[in-house]
Amino acid sequence: VKHRYLGNSGFKVSELTYGNWLTHARQVDNKEAIKTVKAALESGITSFDTADAYANLEAEPILGQALKNERRSGIEIFSKVFWPVADKKPNDHGLSRKHIMESIDGSLSRLGTDYLDLYQAHRYDHETPLEETMQAFADIVRAGKALYIGVSEWTAEQINAGAKLAKELKFQLISNQPQYSMLWRVIEGEVIPASKKNGMTQIVWSPLAQGVLTGKYLPGTAAPEDSRASNTEAAAGGIAKYMSDEALTAIQKLKPLAESL
């Protein structure tokens, strides 16, 4: 697995990143989850992406357990903040200073690490002044709790505003994590140009449209047993919109091209 720089920084990540959104503590038991992390490491993947909201606080500890014996300087750990978790108290969501500061301490504890390589705003918070959010991120970087800051699913306008404030606060936004695949290309019009303008690169989620682009789902045929599409909870995560016979028929036309590469 090759490595490349993330954004306009000296920080390198593996081209393929291991994410545990719909797997750890949900679709895969803990032993199998740890095995998959070990397999990723053996294949050369060094970057691992999670979030406090994944499996409602339960995904981070599993990833932390799987990585606990790894040399910390040889891996890159990403997490995120925004969504409510646990008991969902009034301040337990969004990008307020209170929630960001408490959330990163929780993530560090669950992951068993002293710092995150990348801490990401999981969404944009329309209820908190952006200045408050960016100041909190700046303080986290200065405290050494996170080395770099990124965002997820921000619009071009939000990226421009956030990057400007970050620069004023003497740090930088280096990444955006949007949904992006051959079946979902909405970021190409404005988000990618805004990201490039601000020295940010994409860490895309669902690049295979949650497995649909693997070609294993066939039109007029039931989803394979134990696949994501056969799991009711997973289907609610977004795969259902790609499972029409029309879409699956079109995807099958890509197989000869894929096999020729």
Language model: regions and residue ranges:
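N-terminal binding-site loop/beta-alpha segment at the start of enzyme catalytic domains
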Residues: 1-75, 114, 142
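Conserved, mostly hydrophobic/aromatic
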Residues: 6, 18, 33, 40, ...
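Short acidic capping loops at alpha-helix termini that bridge into adjacent secondary structure
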Residues: 14-15, 72-75, 79, 114-118, ...
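A cross-domain feature marking catalytic cores of carbohydrate-active enzymes
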Residues: 20, 50-52, 79-81, 123, ...
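A short acidic, helix-capping loop that chelates divalent metal ions and anchors anionic groups
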Residues: 22, 84-90, 213
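Short, acidic/polar
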Residues: 27-40, 94-111, 130-135, 159-163
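Active-site gating/metal-coordination segments in enzymes
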Residues: 87-120, 179, 183
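Beta/alpha (TIM)-barrel catalytic core signal, keyed to glycine-rich beta->alpha loops juxtaposed to Asp/Glu
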Residues: 128-261
